[in-house]
């Protein structure tokens, strides 16, 4: 590819620019124009149906290690090869936070991604929210930063590090510390994740004329922590199972830069690409 005539610094800047201009729903001709504007004389010949989209994806995935890039690689290398019965969820709101990825089956796990573009300043609040709701919690960060994490996260928090191979741009993940399963979950916070209708259906409450907080209090009064945790996990699987199932089906046809978009929208790649 002629873009390799650019040095690494130029490629990183170009990849950042392309990511900021990119949208999954843009046409191939529009993407070709964006690519031409960014690369100028270094733009490659676009001689196939998805050439512009593929080139942008490859540059972003290889030279701009932001959250979307790391998340896509973490899915490919860590989450996807696990038990196929696991349901993974993108960007789930929890308390005052939004967890980057979580998975649920027999047990629940949260994964917070901190790239080299991020600070660790928000981890205190995020960890508080995640440990209240999920049985295990992990933070994913770069190989050069992971040893700083123990100062920011509880001892029970697991740690994954990632590094990028300088030869081919591929990412490699390593479990640096195993998460310890939490036994002190906040049932009220779990219930608040669920919408009012799901609470009523799951716990057999009519809910008529009741506010959501009142329904939550009734659930707490009539059910123990273990049962609420079990039903909370069952709700997540039921609510997001179709999203993950569709994503798994279309994943081989989808570029990494578009993973989250196709997960959320559940469309066929042929309609968009």
Model-derived regions: residue spans:
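Eukaryotic low-complexity, intrinsically disordered regulatory segments enriched in serine, proline
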Residues: 56-62, 73-74, 78, 179-181, ...
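Active-site metal-binding core of divalent-cation-utilizing nuclease and nuclease-like domains
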Residues: 62, 66-105, 153
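Conserved beta-strand termini and adjacent loop/short-helix elements that scaffold enzyme active sites
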Residues: 91, 162-165
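Conserved catalytic cores of phosphodiester-cleaving nucleases, focusing on short active-site segments
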Residues: 101-103, 107-117
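Catalytic cores of nucleic-acid endonucleases
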Residues: 117-163
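A conserved mid-domain beta-alpha-beta active-site/ligand-binding segment of alpha/beta enzyme cores
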Residues: 168-240
């Amino acid at each position: 590819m002629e873009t390799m005539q650019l040095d690494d610094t130029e490629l990183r800047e170009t990849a950042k620019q392309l990511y900021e201009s990119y949208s999954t729903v843009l046409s191939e001709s529009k993407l070709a124009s964006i690519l031409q504007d960014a690369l100028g004389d270094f733009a490659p010949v676009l001689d196939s149906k998805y050439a512009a989209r593929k080139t942008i994806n490859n540059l972003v995935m290889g030279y701009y290690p932001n959250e979307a890039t790391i998340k896509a690689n973490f899915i490919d290398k860590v989450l996807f090869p696990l038990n196929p019965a696991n349901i993974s969820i993108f960007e789930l709101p929890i308390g005052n936070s939004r967890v980057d990825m979580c998975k649920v089956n027999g047990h629940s796990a949260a994964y917070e991604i901190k790239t080299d573009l991020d600070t660790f300043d928000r981890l205190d609040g995020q960890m508080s929210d995640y440990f209240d709701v999920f049985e295990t919690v992990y933070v994913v960060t770069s190989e050069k930063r992971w040893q700083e994490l123990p100062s920011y996260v509880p001892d029970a928090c697991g740690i994954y590090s990632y590094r990028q191979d300088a030869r081919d741009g591929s990412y490699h993940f390593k479990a640096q510390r195993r998460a310890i399963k939490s036994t002190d979950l906040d049932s009220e916070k779990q219930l608040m994740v669920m919408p009012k209708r799901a609470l009523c259906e799951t716990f057999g409450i009519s809910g008529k004329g009741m506010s959501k907080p009142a329904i939550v209090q009734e659930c707490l009064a009539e059910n123990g922590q273990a049962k609420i945790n079990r039903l909370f996990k069952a709700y997540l699987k039921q609510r997001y199972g179709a999203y993950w199932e569709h994503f798994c089906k279309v994943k081989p046809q989808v570029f990494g830069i578009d993973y989250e978009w196709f997960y959320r929208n559940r469309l066929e790649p042929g309609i968009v690409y």
